[in-house]
UniProtKB/Swiss-Prot annotation:
This is Phosphoribosylamine--glycine ligase. Disulfide bonds: none annotated. Belongs to the GARS family. SUPFAM superfamilies: Glutathione synthetase ATP-binding domain-like, PreATP-grasp domain, Rudiment single hybrid motif. It comes from Thermotoga maritima (strain ATCC 43589 / DSM 3109 / JCM 10099 / NBRC 100826 / MSB8). Its EC number is 6.3.4.13. It comes from the Bacteria.
Amino acid sequence: MKAVRVHILGSGGREHAIGWAFAKQGYEVHFYPGNAGTKRDGTNHPYEGEKTLKAIPEEDIVIPGSEEFLVEGVSNWRSNVFGPVKEVARLEGSKVYAKRFMKKYGIRTARFEVAETPEELREKIKKFSPPYVIKADGLARGKGVLILDSKEETIEKGSKLIIGELIKGVKGPVVIDEFLAGNELSAMAVVNGRNFVILPFVRDYKRLMDGDRGPNTGGMGSWGPVEIPSDTIKKIEELFDKTLWGVEKEGYAYRGFLYLGLMLHDGDPYILEYNVRLGDPETEVIVTLNPEGFVNAVLEGYRGGKMEPVEPRGFAVDVVLAARGYPDAPEKGKEITLPEEGLIFFAGVAEKDGKLVTNGGRVLHCMGTGETKEEARRKAYELAEKVHFEGKTYRRDIAL
């Protein structure tokens, strides 16, 4: 085992994938709280906030998987956390802060207004034409964006969002964004200060059903690497550079992962949103493409060393198996049977009486790899078909 231990905060497929990559390179891995699958690659522990962080040795590295930990301030509690401090995590934690940050530092984003009351919303919506885009200020677990054609419906739902009657636990100001047509793209990087290395580009599928139909989800699958023209990559690098320059001007140094949610509009990438952590299910594909390269990039980013590009080896496809009722009311407690072979990252899985059972919306990530996208896709779907639980739901068009 390597001298440095790795402590991963979270319980989803993304966290399992990160831990798997480190375990594969010989690191001792600990998960907080983890799930029924993560303990195959490390040790699970309860997560008790600051108390948990204080007990982790200073020489070890802590990697928060999801944004809640960073917004909570885990990087403020300890210096061995690979993630930005909570003041910088506001880039994800507050859409209003993020949009004002982009405007302040001349970073390309959609034209916007902020409305703090229903009356302001009614007045400011007049500056926009349909479709109307309304975004909740705070974290809303992927449910905080409304895209509507009717001005009256936008005012009605946007007002409910402001006063806390639309989404449970979400209230406060909203961002009105100009609608941008184009192709969405995610760009993720490992960052230390002004230095960064962009990870392989991955396409994910947000809608529940084939053909991009049905409700939005956390993501039903992904594949990579996606080929991006070099001139577009150069423009994306400029967006990362300007963002990190802005963070520095605000008096902070960025260390951790940075994710740009982009829209390619008229040949230029615009930032729709920032995330201060890796995407899920994109992470599962990135680490599978080159686990060793991913681990090295993270460790060099953590230490402030020279980060090398993570070169993809072949192709990888992730097919997500979800529970019936996802995303609104996923069924839990259904027994799972798994094949003996194949790479599967666990998400909403628990152990009950020695058996694996469903315990969340997205249950498992079935991975396929190959020299071609078609080979990787075939393997991922062959694996998905060998997994059994009542109500298994998945898309058939990932990586087509």
